[in-house]
Structures are given as C-alpha cells and as structure tokens.
Amino acid sequence: MKDSFLFTSESVTEGHPDKMADQISDAVLDYIIERDKKAKVACETLVSNGFCVITGELKTSIYAPMQEIAREVVKKIGYTDALYGFDYRSAAVLNGIGEQSPDINQGVDREDGEIGAGDQGLVFGYACKETQMLMPLPIHLAHQLTFALAQKRKDNTLPFLRPDGKSQVSVRYENNKPISIDTIVISTQHSPEVSQKHLKEAVIEEIVYKVLPKEYLHDNIKFFVNPTGKFVIGGPQGDAGLTGRKIIVDTYGGSCPHGGGAFSGKDPSKVDRSAAYAARYVAKNLVASGVCDRATVQLAYAIGVVEPVSIYVNTHNTSKYSSAELEKCVKLVFKLTPKGIIESLDLLRPIYSLTSSYGHFGRELEAFTWEKTNKAEEIKAFFKH
C-alpha cells in the first residue's frame, strides 16, 4: 500500500527582522573571534522600529565597535532607506553587553587544557538522501527561494522587491521519498507602486521556475504569493526581531527534533552551536558512507563536563546495523568533546556570519567544515571488521 503525505518547511530572507538580529550577533562574534580566539561570546540582538539593542555577555581582551558592526550588517542586507522600514544610518544602536559570569567560565576553561561544555544541553544532527547535499528537500527548496528573492533584489532583476521576505514549500512524499512540490508560499516586501498581479507573475517566473529543480515542478502546484495582499511595511518596522527565533529555519525545517538551543552570537565553547555542527557532521558522514539512508544523531552535554553524557543514533530502519553498533562507531571515529569538536572542525575562525542566513546546514561552502564527508571511509572500514 502506498504511503503518501505532505511535509512542509519554511525559510526567511536575510532582511527578515529575526535574521537581521542573527546576522548582527554573528558579525559581533566574528569581529571578536578573529582578534581573540580565547574569547567567550554570547551576543543577543533586538531590532525594532528605528533601533537596535545589542546585549549578552563577553569575556575578551579586545574592544568591539558594536555600532559600526551593526550598521554595516544592516547596510549590507539592504536597509538603506527609511522607506524600507529601517535605515542603517539613522537607526539608534544601543550597547548593553556585560561581562561573562566567572562561575560559568571556571567550568569551561580547565587547568588540564580540556574545555568543559559551556552549558548543559542536547542537540540533534540529521542527514538523508533526498538531495545531493544530504538534506531534506522541503527546507532545501525553501532556502533556494529566499536566497533567490534577495539576489533578484540586489542585482535589480526585480527592483520593486524589498529586504523582508519568507518562503514555505510543501512537498508530496510517497513511501518516504519526495515526488513533487504541492504548494509554494512566498511573502515578500515590495515597493508601494507595484501591482500584486505583476509581483506574483514576476516572482513565479523569475524565481520559482528559474530556481527550483524541474523534476519536482508541474502544472498543478498551488501558489500563494503575498496571500494577504500588499506587503509594503516590513522589516523591523513591521515586526521586532530577536536573535535565535528561527531555529527550525536554521536547521532541518522540522524534519528531525531540535534541542531548543539557538546558534547565532555564540562562540564554539557553547555546545548549543558547536555540538549541533558536530551532530550534523556525524549524521552526514554516516549517510555518505552508505551504512544508512537517513540518520538522526543526538548528543547531550553537562556544563563543565568534557565528554558527552549521551550519544544516540537512529537510522529510521534504513540500516542493517543496530543503534549500539552505530554508537560504538561514532565514538571511535569522531571527537565529540568540546575541544575535539572545535579542533576537528576548525571552529575558532570568523566564519559565523556566513551561517546566519539561509541555513547552517546543507551548504557546501569551504568554511562549513561540518559539511565535509571526509569520515565516510573510516566508517566503512569500521563496519568491514
């Protein structure tokens, strides 16, 4: 009997208020970590109507010009006119950063050279064979659409587009394999003079049909482009934005569980971020090695403790190996202490602004070391013995 269902994921553009906040937090992190690799950073950002607040905790020896960093991010996104809902030149930027608690730091920086986890927490990694990047198809397509919205705006192909926007893609599955796109929702901020008819036609022709894979397109796709009508007021003028409010967009679009911890603004001693990257690295290499078609990996940590307190691997009935065998392999092949993760993935680099929009996973950029499949052969060798 054929098992058929729909699964939906969403993405947002770099001009979405929550993503603006993520990008500012990660730009602050990058500025600091480039100059002080021993820094501890937990940077949170709020953007609202005409102002930005940067807060959180730092332990660093260098000065970071918060105002300049925030304004440069907002300018790069494209909020260059108050008519867009925010202007990088006139917006107020308030700095409320404080010092990291020494109670936390004593458990992280240890005398034996190891690094304790910066907090307790559980994280998940995921990989599957639905795309070349070993990502779920719905989130992959949703990111392609929002990235294209930004590119078509910036290169002036669709000059009436403005920075804020979202996408949502519903994919039809049969027997756990994606077969077609069912519904596409795109909401995009725009200039007041463009008609909704022209906007919809342009978005479908210039973005959807030029970006999405032909094998999933068909004549019966349901399109909803700005379904409520006009979307002129957007960005922080329309909605406040906060760091860490798009954690499902940042990860797998709901295709696997989420531990609840956000990524942006956190240095890699925070396992919310670094261990989530490691969990993706593990899951992707398991799938790339051929020992399974799909993998969900959970890692859990205790504050100040070096080794993970638990490792869990679920291959969703796509592997001939047991969870216990797979866990044994993972422990042998991967370094999953905070220090091991930081060193093996080379995380003390200013790479985090690249992650802060269009997904932390499934993008094969050179800086994204957790996307490499260089452990696949070791995994194969483990199961040959």
From Swiss-Prot:
K(+) binds at residue 44. It is found in: Cytoplasm. L-methionine binds at residues 57, 100, 239, 270. ATP binds at residues 16, 164-166, 230-231, 239, 245-246, 262, 266. The keyword rRNA-binding does not apply. Mg(2+) binds at residue 18. The keyword Repressor does not apply. Binds 2 divalent ions per subunit. GO terms for biological process: one-carbon metabolic process; S-adenosylmethionine biosynthetic process. Its cofactor is Mg(2+); K(+). InterPro entries: ADOMET_SYNTHASE_CS, S-AdoMet_synt_C, S-AdoMet_synt_central, S-AdoMet_synt_N, S-AdoMet_synthetase, S-AdoMet_synthetase_sfam. Pfam families: S-AdoMet_synt_C, S-AdoMet_synt_M, S-AdoMet_synt_N. Keywords: ATP-binding, Cytoplasm, Magnesium, Metal-binding, Nucleotide-binding, One-carbon metabolism, Potassium, Transferase. Its EC number is 2.5.1.6. One of its GO terms (cellular component) is cytoplasm. It is an enzyme of class 2 (transferase). It catalyses: L-methionine + ATP + H2O = S-adenosyl-L-methionine + phosphate + diphosphate. Residues 100-110 are annotated as: Flexible loop. GO terms for molecular function: ATP binding; magnesium ion binding; methionine adenosyltransferase activity. Belongs to the AdoMet synthase family. Catalyzes the formation of S-adenosylmethionine (AdoMet) from methionine and ATP. The overall synthetic reaction is composed of two sequential steps, AdoMet formation and the subsequent tripolyphosphate hydrolysis which occurs prior to release of AdoMet from the enzyme. Homotetramer; dimer of dimers. This is S-adenosylmethionine synthase.
